From Swiss-Prot:
HAMAP family: MOC2B (MF_03052). Its main location: cytoplasm. GO terms for cellular component: cytosol; molybdopterin synthase complex. One of its GO terms (molecular function) is molybdopterin synthase activity. Substrate binds at H107, R108, K123, K130, K131, E132. Pathway: Cofactor biosynthesis; molybdopterin biosynthesis. This is Molybdopterin synthase catalytic subunit. Heterotetramer; composed of 2 small (mocs2s) and 2 large (mocs2l) subunits. Keywords: Cytoplasm, Molybdenum cofactor biosynthesis, Transferase. The gene is mocs2l.
Length: 158
């Protein structure tokens, strides 16, 4: 099986089907399947959120996600079996999912660490932008990802 046949990527406006993606990465040689499911929460910095809207330059986003997947397949003690990543674009209401990362591996440590690496790297390198829409009608702004802002207490506006 080539590395490319172990990578499954989709950018879609459709609701994410968890069972479908778990089946895609299912592998009889796997002892673990780990995942991350990102959902739209109902609040941001005290404002009530109605929905998020995502946009991307799809060819570049897919290319960047492929790079991340290949890095994962070449690392983690060559224990990764398959990787599935789907990111929604368009409107994603509160409670619905915007991204799913599912990774199967021989052992749990590899898939858990790979999922963590994947989401952090996707959020910092892949050209996908979101706009929050608030229930009070206040100004909506496009936001890029700035992973370190939330963890280092930097006072960025997003």
């Amino acid at each position: 099986m080539s590395k490319e046949s172990r990578i499954f990527i989709e950018i879609s406006e459709n609701i994410i089907d968890l069972n479908y993606w778990y089946k895609i990465v299912s592998d009889d040689s796997s002892g673990a399947t780990s995942s991350f499911l990102g959902t739209t929460r109902n609040e941001f910095k005290g404002k009530s959120v109605e929905r998020l809207e995502y946009e991307t330059y799809e060819p570049m986003a897919i290319k960047e996600i492929e790079k991340i997947c290949k890095t994962i397949l070449n690392g983690f003690e060559n224990d990764i079996k398959k990787i599935g990543i789907v990111h929604r674009i368009g409107n994603v209401p509160v409670g619905e999912s915007s991204i799913l990362i599912v990774i199967s591996s021989g052992h749990r440590k590899s898939s858990l660490e790979a999922v963590h690496y994947a989401i952090d790297t996707i959020k910092s390198t892949v050209p996908i932008w979101k706009k929050e829409f608030y229930t009070d009608g206040s100004e909506n702004q496009w936001k890029g990802n700035c992973e370190s802002c939330h963890f280092n207490n930097n006072n960025h506006p997003h």
